[in-house]
Every structure is written in C-alpha cells, then in structure tokens.
Amino acid sequence: VTGGRPGSVPERGGSEQTAVPPPPDILFRRFGPRAELLARYAAWLAGPGTVRGLLGPREVPRLWERHLLNSVALADLLPDGARLVDVGSGAGLPGLAVACVRPDLAVDLVEPLLRRTDFLTEVVADLALGQHVRVVRGRAEDSAVLDKVGSAQFVTARAVAPLDRLVRWSFPLLRPGGSLLALKGTGAEDELAEHQQFLARMRAEVRGVIECGAELVDPPTRVVHLVRGR
C-alpha cells in the first residue's frame, strides 16, 4: 500500500488506520532498510489487525516491545538460508516478523483459521514477501500440511500450546536433527521439567533455554530449543 505516512496502512476507502508507535532506532541499526518493512507490518497489526480481532487494541501501545521485538529476536538463532515453519502463526508472530528482516529465509506460516490466513495473505502481498513466505491454511497435524511443509530445518511457535502438545504437532514437520524453537516466557524451565519424561519418549534432545535479542528487548526473548532425534 502506498500513499500513507510511514507506520500507517490506508483503508480501502483511503483513510488511515490506527497509527502504531514509531519503531525504535535499534531496529534500523540492526536491520537497516528491512526495518521499514517491519514498521509497515506493525501498521497492519495496529490497524486491520485490531479491527479484525487479531490483536487487542490495548496491545497497540506496547506492540514493539511485547510482540515485534520479542519475535524478531528469533532471527539471531537462524542460519543463512534456513527454512522455518511457524505453527499456529495467528497474525504472523513470530514468523512473519522474522521474514520482514531476513529475506534469506524460506518461511511457511501455518494457521487453520480463514480470517487469519486472509490477513496474512494480504500482508505478505502488500510487503512483497511472496517469493520467500508462504501462507498455509491448516493445522500442523493435518496430512495436507505435512505434505506441504514437512522436513523443515526449524519449527517455531509463540503462545500456541503447552510444550507437550507443541512437540506432538511440530516434530512430524521437522527433518531428523531439525530444531523446535519455542518462544516461552519465565516459565520455560518449569515446562521442560514438567514434560521431561514425555520429551524423552519423543526422543527430543533438550538443548536448553536460550535468551536472545538482549540488545533489542528487555527482558530478552526466551526460547526453548529442542532437537528431533535422528
């Protein structure tokens, strides 16, 4: 969409949606011009995203620190040219946020709800990300989804499900030796301890809890790293 000020998304009728707070300077220092794509995505979340019920209006003032910076911190853990599947992508967090700043990645956004996949498809088209981002409608456990996105190097998820369910859904999508990078909060270690026996049965190698993005967001993003056994 063109013609609006940075950080806003014009409606179809021409008026502007809710403006998002300006992006922090650190974003441009880290990601250069790609940060502008993330700012446009932020405007989609603050405008159409809130109108369609994908993001609560009260989240708009803290959109950067609570949602976007928390998500793009994941980029630090992904090697060049990696293939990433975002399970239960919702409004695109974290997968679409990461795709905005990492054009080298191949990203699949897996989401079962039509209103969410419609939103994701519109944003991907508007930001011209279609060459390296796909929107896949379905549940992670669906055979059709497995056929499309299986054998991934990395699967990620944010605020989707407890760790045991997330492993059940995501491990079939991973190649042997592939990694689940689950964004979790302060309870990450407790979840690992709670599901220790289940993870052993699933032959999940626990690599621990990684803190990343300390220069972007405080507190840093906390990621549970599990590897599918070979």
PLM region descriptions:
Residues R52-G53, P61-R62, A91, R158-A161, ...:
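Flexible, active-site-adjacent loop/turn segments at secondary-structure boundaries
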Residues P6, L105-D108, P112-R230:
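S-adenosylmethionine
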Residues V87-S89:
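Conserved beta-strand/loop positions that form the S-adenosyl-L-methionine
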Residues G49-T50, A91-L93, E205-R207:
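Residue-level signal for pocket-adjacent positions within structured domains
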Residues A91-D104:
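Conserved SAM-binding loop of SAM-dependent methyltransferases across substrates and taxa
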Residues V1-V85, R115-D118, E122-Q131:
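Class I SAM-dependent transferase core
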